[in-house]
């Protein structure tokens, strides 16, 4: 076999693309005052053109500011222009100050150039901004916040990472520019901004493709979509459940199950066909925003006085929540819009090659039993598990499952139980028990210690404590340095008890349904040494272990060494800022074209991962300009505020769904 090596060349030049007057060219500062460190890159030339050749698979370059930190706070984006000279595409990821959340990414096609946009996050908002724009995560003027660990006025470094680069590939990275001026509104400028949401739920002060100005345009968009779905009703190689009808047929049980087939984990549908779960969450809802106390943000809805506002407005807990999405469906379909929404949601998903209605979706859509779905049970208090040793924990689970219509429904794939629990480190649960959060668990902890230690004096020696009686131990809430091993042991015992109880409850009340796990939070838990302990425990009880994984790829998600179990992505997304919303989501995608491209690659990577049996995008709708209850106002939907598709993402989903079974079976 002949091997061809393509060289990687990274070149920084001082020529820049056309930049606005308020943009800042960062490259001259880099070359004059900053420092550059590389990993897996070899410098081959000097001067103002910086040129490296990759010497290994996976490489990166880090640019540091020097003695004085950079001030990125006047800008919204850091933009790097990347030219790929190789004969295959190149993945590029940018990080600001090494922060997990502040990233930008893109796939640069072979022999092409692409601009990689990185969103400059704000660590916190001023008191004035919080008062002027309450309960909004993204604000007018370019302010977006997540859990970033840096301050934009003091940036010390940023990196460009090439995790899939091969030794010898060539790339030119040129023109580093800070773009789009950042602005904070106050005084007259703030007053002039108001109202900033129009009668259709769109941001007033921006122009973008697809923005409407009248009801007629909503109707026109609906007709266009109907014709599109007529042209593409769905994948003809799928069976009624979305399984691979043209593929092998395994044992049919009448329900979904999981099986390892030819070295890869698969779901198997009720008819025995291989099934890979290509899904979307929150189908049929998820755009409500509280208008009470913020009335000045919104233009009048311009509706007749006779309109029944309860069709799109709900009032609860001192909140008045308006769904512009429902209002706009009312405008095009009338009072019976819900019936048409349910029908269209089912036809849409099939047309988009989506075969799973994922978490938190509308029960009325699910009950049509036209597309497989996942069910969800919540036992948690915030991010805390319930006390797994409480008698009510198991009883409550069984009552909830028994009352669920999904328990015996062949269209239900399985149950997620809880979401993004706070597991902490491997002593966390025992520490909470010791401190009194879990009284039943604390009693069990005491009894295990009584069995382990010959006497309380022996425990005191190990822990460095001075308990006179076990009653004293029960009253104590202090954590002693010598207790670490016992805390580790009991944390494991508690976690086992939690997952075991859920598994047994599902087996008792929904024996044919899969236990899909607890949707581990955000990062790459598998492979993370700090958190691997809890993933391995979950895998003993879950039929499929789930991760809400907001990264740019799912390919590297693997069980720990010597483990083998199926996994599923419960949430991921890539957001944009080019369609009138004010926040780019938990993973920024930039333009609609780029976020669609990121979607396509993410799902294809997951399809090729032998352990993954599905990906579920969060979420069906774009969120509201002024945000949901916790302030999320992300442009992350498959559809926009007036119920029209975000076409770039639709095309990406169709493309992936058209070939996913053939790709996975290779």
Protein language model regions, located:
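Short carbohydrate-recognition loop motifs
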Residues: 40-60
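Active-site-adjacent substrate/metal-binding segments within catalytic domains
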Residues: 203-368, 382-410, 474, 480-481, ...
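Polysaccharide-binding and catalytic clefts of secreted carbohydrate-active enzymes
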Residues: 270, 280, 294-334, 409-532
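Aromatic-rich peripheral "rim/lid" segments of glycoside hydrolase catalytic domains that contact
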Residues: 432-444, 618-666
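Substrate-binding cleft of secreted/luminal carbohydrate-active enzymes
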Residues: 410-414, 418-420, 586-639, 650
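Extracellular ligand-binding interfaces
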Residues: 53-145, 169
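Active-site clefts of carbohydrate-active enzymes
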Residues: 321-328, 383-387, 474-488, 520-522, ...
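Glycoside hydrolase catalytic-domain groove-lining segments
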Residues: 489, 493-585, 600-607
């Amino acid at each position: 076999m002949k091997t061809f090596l393509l060289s990687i060349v990274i070149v920084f030049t001082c020529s820049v693309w056309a930049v606005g007057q308020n943009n800042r060219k960062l490259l001259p500062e880099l070359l004059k005052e900053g420092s550059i460190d590389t990993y897996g890159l070899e410098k081959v030339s000097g001067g103002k053109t910086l040129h490296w050749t990759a010497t290994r698979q996976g490489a990166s370059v880090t640019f540091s500011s020097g003695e004085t930190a950079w001030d990125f706070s006047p800008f919204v984006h850091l933009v790097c222009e990347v030219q790929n000279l190789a004969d295959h595409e190149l993945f590029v990821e940018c990080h600001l100050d090494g922060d997990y959340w502040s990233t930008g990414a893109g796939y640069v096609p072979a022999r092409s150039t692409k601009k990689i946009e990185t969103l400059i996050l704000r660590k916190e908002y001023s008191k004035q901004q919080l008062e002027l724009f309450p309960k909004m995560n993204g604000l007018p003027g370019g302010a977006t916040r997540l859990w970033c660990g840096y301050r934009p006025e003091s940036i010390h470094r940023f990196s460009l990472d090439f995790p899939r680069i091969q030794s010898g590939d060539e790339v030119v990275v040129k023109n580093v520019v800070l773009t789009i001026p950042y602005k904070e509104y106050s005084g007259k400028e703030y007053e002039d901004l108001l109202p900033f949401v129009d009668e259709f739920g769109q941001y007033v002060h921006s122009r973008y493709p697809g923005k409407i100005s009248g009801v007629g345009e909503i109707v026109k968009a609906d007709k266009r979509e109907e014709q599109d779905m007529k042209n593409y009703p769905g994948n003809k190689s799928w069976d009624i459940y979305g399984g691979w009808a043209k593929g092998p047929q395994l044992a049919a049980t009448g329900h979904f199950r999981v099986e390892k087939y030819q070295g890869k984990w698969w779901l198997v549908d009720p008819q025995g066909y291989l099934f890979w779960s290509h899904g979307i969450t929150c189908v049929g809802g998820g755009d409500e925003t509280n208008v009470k106390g913020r009335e000045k943000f919104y233009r009048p809805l311009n509706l007749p006085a006779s309109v029944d506002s309860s069709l799109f407005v709900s009032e609860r807990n001192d909140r008045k929540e308006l769904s512009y999405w429902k209002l706009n469906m009312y405008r095009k379909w009338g009072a019976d819009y819900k019936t048409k929404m349910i029908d269209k949601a089912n036809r849409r998903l099939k047309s988009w090659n989506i075969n799973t209605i994922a978490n938190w979706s509308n029960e009325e859509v699910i009950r049509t039993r036209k597309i497989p779905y996942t069910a969800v049970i919540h036992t948690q208090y915030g991010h805390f598990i319930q006390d797994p040793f409480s008698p009510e924990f198991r009883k409550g689970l069984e009552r909830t499952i028994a009352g669920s219509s999904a328990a015996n429904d062949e269209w239900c794939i399985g149950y997620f139980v809880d979401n993004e629990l706070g597991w902490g480190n491997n002593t966390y649960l025992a520490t909470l028990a010791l401190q009194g959060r879990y009284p039943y668990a604390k009693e069990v902890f005491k009894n295990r210690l009584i069995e382990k230690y010959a006497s309380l004096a022996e425990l005191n020696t190990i822990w460095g404590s001075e308990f006179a009686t076990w009653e004293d131990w029960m009253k104590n809430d202090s954590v002693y340095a010598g207790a670490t091993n016992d805390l580790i042991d009991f944390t494991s015992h508690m976690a086992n008890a939690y997952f075991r109880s859920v598994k047994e409850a599902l087996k008792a009340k929904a024996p044919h349904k899969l236990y899909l796990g607890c949707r581990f939070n955000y990062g790459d838990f598998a492979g993370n040494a700090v958190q691997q302990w809890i993933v391995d425990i979950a895998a003993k009880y879950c039929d499929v272990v789930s991760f809400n994984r907001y990264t740019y790829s799912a390919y590297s998600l693997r069980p720990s060494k010597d483990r083998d179990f199926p996994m599923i992505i419960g949430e991921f997304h890539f957001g944009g800022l080019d369609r009138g919303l004010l926040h780019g989501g938990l993973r920024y995608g930039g333009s609609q074209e780029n976020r669609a491209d990121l979607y396509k690659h993410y799902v294809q990577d997951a399809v090729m991962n032998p352990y993954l049996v599905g990906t579920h995008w969060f979420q069906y709708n774009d969120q509201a300009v002024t945000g949901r209850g916790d302030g999320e106002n992300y442009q992350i939907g498959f559809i926009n505020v007036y119920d029209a598709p975000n076409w770039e993402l639709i095309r990406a989903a169709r493309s992936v769904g058209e070939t996913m079974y053939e790709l996975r079976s290779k």
